[in-house]
Structures are given as structure tokens and as C-alpha cells.
From Swiss-Prot:
Protein name in UniProt: Uncharacterized WD repeat-containing protein C2A9.03
Cytoplasm among keywords: yes
Record-linked Gene3D superfamilies: YVTN repeat-like/Quinoprotein amine dehydrogenase
Localization annotation: Cytoplasm
WD repeats: 217-255, 298-337, 341-380
Amino acid sequence: MSNGEFIDQYLLPESGAILQDYLDDYFYTSWYTGNRNLIQLDHYGFPTASNFELNPKSTDNCGTVDFQGIPWGNKAIGKRKNFRLYRLHTYSLSCNHSDWSPEELSLDTVQVAAEDSFYEFQRFLKNPNCLRNHHHLCKSVKVVGEHSVIYVSNNSIRMENTLHDNSVQIIDLKNNILQKKAISCLDTTNAVGCLGTLYGQYCIFNFKNGSFSTRKLSDDSINHIQLFSEKKFILGCNDGAVYVEDVQRTSPILVYRCSNAVNCVQLFDETPLALVCTDSKDAMLIDIRSNSVSAKLPHSDSVLTGSWHPNGNILATGGQDTTAKVWDIRALGKSFRNLGSQMSAVTNLCFSPLGESLAVTEQADFVQLFDTKLFNTSQVIDFFGEIAGTAYSSSGDSLFIGVDDPMLGGILEFRRPLQHPLSFIF
């Protein structure tokens, strides 16, 4: 097969483009092996969703149906592996620091486990309209309990019961947030939730009775929110500020100001040590009592996300350099694992509640699950679409992935088998 050259007049889609744009270009490359004359188009000339839905009356369902119900292998759309190769070769990456290349990254060798070895595919719900309003802020999906998925949809927060495929609106902010598609980040506890916007507002809400309160913090985006009690949360902002908010106070407390935009800030329980990830090449451990930097954790490009292991000794950071690094807080001289992504920037990291696995979420198409015993075995979850967020259930038995795409989006659910191989040390 050739390298999939483009006909000259067709351009690569930009970062964060919807799948419809990629598919429209894909059909004019040598990767495509289907029949363009069979593709159904809308009045703008773009392929419609009907091309990627199984037609039970058709005699052309000779291929395999993937997680998203796409009937790959039929005469119209061709083989799945060809579109996967196209995405891998053409997906647009952005960077803030240009003095590095993927070839220079020193990555650990990881054994890819058999499909469904850690978590098995359970269901794909197409009705939820999950939104991620910035391609690096993959923080729009949370889970309460075992089956209630909280997600961002337009200017509202909705809750999906995945057992019954039933979605209800928790709060509608269209009259409280002036701009459309403004919600940038989300976090929840068992009783309340909190969200931030791209325009400096934040909102705390009760998803059981629908009550909420909004406040204005600044004119810059709030990039991350973490609730560490039902009345306190920490915020990371695009102007470099880190705030702690107590809802009983009249204004938040500025605890640190970075020289770059803060993409993620994570406190471990209620300790004073915060993991702060910024647009610089370093994540930082900051003591919020003394406003001092305890350690720097280097990457090759902007650091977008971080997460603490439940034991408090291990943490992970990920960023635009397409790596996830794992650190031991007792020996921070260098990361002890350097894990590579499959296609794009690492935008979300989360350990399972008991710490057996680490979910490494990319900007699009891939979530990798690493066994935290040695971080040398992974399960690769492969689908298509920009990722709105990834979250474990409270027990860690289920993993939910929000896919933001108007044609192929929804919520993917994976469930741990009764006999599972995951284990961990530390």
C-alpha cells in the first residue's frame, strides 16, 4: 500500500476537527479502498451518519462492527484498519515548545495485552451529547456511584444512567453563562458538583435537587477544578493563578501564581501538597501553605494533566509531548516510567480508586490502561472521535469514556471481568 498521498486540493483537518471532516478527506486518499459512489452525502457534500450505521436489511454487512457500531468492511466505507492508518498519519498535533521531536523521546517498552484483558466492552450509548469545549481540556465526564455518568452538554450538565440509557438534565446554565459552549471543566462528589468556564466563571451545584450558584473569578479560562470536600475546591486558571475556594467565604484565596497557564491542579486528599501542571515544560509540586515549589517534574512540552495514586507515593503527569510519566514522590530525581501515547497529546490521567490501573487518555481515539504493578503492560482501547473525558466508577469496576463527535459520539462503558489480572504494588 502507498503512503496515502492526498489529491493536491485537499488539506489536512485542523486539530480537534470532527470525524466528518476527516472522513471527507479520507475518501480522496489512496488509503481509502471503498466505493465513493456508494457514500451518502448531505446537502453540503459531507458524508452522513447513515454510512456508519449497521443496516439490518443490507446484504453488504460482511465486515466487523466495532465499539461504535460502525459496519467496517462494507463496499462503501471499506476497511477499518485503513481509516486507522489514515488517522495515525494525519492527525494534527499542536505544541507550545518546538525544540523537541518524537524521535528524541526515551520511552519504555510496554507489552500490549490482549483486547478486553483488563476491562471488557460493555455498551456504547449514542444518545448522550458529550461536549469538550477545548481540545486540551478533557475534563467533561465524571461518575457518581456505579452507573451515573455526569457530563457536559452544550451549556448544561446532564446525568446518564447507563443501565437504563436514560439521560436527565441536572442544571441549565444558558441564562447564567453568556457565551455558548463555555464549560471547560467539571468535578463531582457524591452530592455536589462544580464546573468552570472558558470565561472565568465557576458554578457549584447540587445534582440531586438541581440548585446551583455561579460566581465570576476572572476574565481568563478556568482550566481545572478539583473538589476536595463538599464545601472546598481548588481551581487552576489560564492566567497562572491557583485558588482555593471555600463556599462559606466571600472570595477565593490565591495560593500560588505561576508564570504560565495552569492546565491541571491536584491536591492529594487534604494535604498541603498540590501537583500543578502548566504550559511550561515542568509540572510542579507546590506546598500551598508556604507558596513554595517543592519539586519540578520535567517534560518536553506543556504539561496538560496529572494524577495522584491513592497511596500518595506515586503520581503521573502527561502532556503535549505525547508522554505520560510516572514518578515516585520518595525519589523525584527522574521519572521511573516514560509511557508513550498511540497518536496524540495526553490530556487526562486518572488512577482507578484502588490504584490497580492508570487510564491514559489522549486528545482523540485512544485510552490506554496500564497495570500499575510495573507499568509494563497495557490494554489499548481503540475507537474514533475527540475525547470529552474518562472516569472510573466509585468501585473501579467500570470505566466510562465520553466521545465528543456529532456523528459518532456518545459514552463508551467498559467493565472489569470477575477474574481480572490487575494488581499493584507501592
